[in-house]
């Protein structure tokens, strides 16, 4: 548990790029789970290296790792119930350093994301990932070591606090405040946020602020190599933080400013 038992409420903003929204629009979510959990995984596939001209004398970990990557994608379609949210992504794949050498080791890194508050979906994915990786590796005479780390829980938004936030942002911004469920249909997003740890300790609301869309030349979303943010919205984000704090303290502690 975080040492924040003295905190009564928490609020955060995340910038959002590449969306066709007016710059500075504040998106306020509904209550419940709004963002997925996230966990890192690392798979190390070990074979036997050697010269590229003599593959018969080697055990190629690249081939095994490539088949593992493909096999893992079947977890979503063949093992999760329809409607269960689970995303398994390999974002990094490394093996070898020379074009004429079969390496000893191939490695994969990635993430697992679910919106299951009890993380049973995540447990299933972890179990099957380990079994699949080790089984496929063995089929290619390799071994596979699978490890998991850095679990971050789902973001949980407090519904009464979200309703407060919508009222406060409307007071401050008028039509610049938007109910995020109009875009999401009330479904959780697949992104993750470590502020979620706070949301499991105290009532929390996590909001987004539009930081540029196609009209501003910000055509790409988060983590795209060409992503751009319109930093003219920074003052608005600061004002929103301040206004939320002032209004919440007035409503809940009778503190007037």
Where are these regions (language model features)?
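Metal-dependent amide/peptide-bond hydrolase catalytic core
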Residues: 66-257
């Amino acid at each position: 548990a975080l040492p924040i038992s003295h905190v009564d409420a928490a609020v955060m903003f995340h910038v959002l790029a590449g969306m066709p929204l007016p710059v500075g629009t504040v998106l306020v979510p509904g209550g419940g789970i709004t963002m997925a959990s996230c966990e890192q995984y690392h798979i190390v596939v070990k074979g036997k290296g050697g010269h590229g001209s003599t593959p018969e004398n080697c055990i190629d970990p690249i081939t095994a790792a490539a088949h593992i990557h493909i096999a893992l994608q079947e977890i979503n379609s063949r093992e999760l119930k329809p409607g269960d949210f689970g995303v398994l992504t390999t974002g990094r794949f490394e093996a070898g350093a020379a074009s004429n050498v079969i390496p000893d080791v191939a490695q994969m890194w990635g993430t697992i994301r679910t919106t299951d508050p009890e993380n049973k979906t995540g447990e299933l994915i972890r179990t099957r990932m380990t079994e699949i990786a080790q089984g496929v590796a063995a089929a290619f005479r390799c071994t596979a070591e699978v490890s998991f780390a850095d679990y971050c829980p789902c973001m949980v938004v407090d519904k009464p606090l979200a309703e407060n936030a919508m009222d406060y942002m409307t007071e401050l911004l008028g039509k610049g405040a938007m109910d995020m469920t109009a875009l999401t249909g009330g479904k959780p997003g697949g992104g993750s946020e470590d502020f979620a740890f706070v949301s499991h300790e105290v009532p929390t609301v996590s909001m987004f602020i539009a930081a540029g869309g196609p009209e501003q030349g910000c055509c790409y979303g988060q983590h795209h190599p060409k992503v751009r943010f319109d930093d003219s919205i920074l003052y608005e984000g600061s004002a929103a933080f301040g206004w939320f704090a002032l209004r919440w303290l007035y409503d809940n502690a009778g503190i007037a400013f």
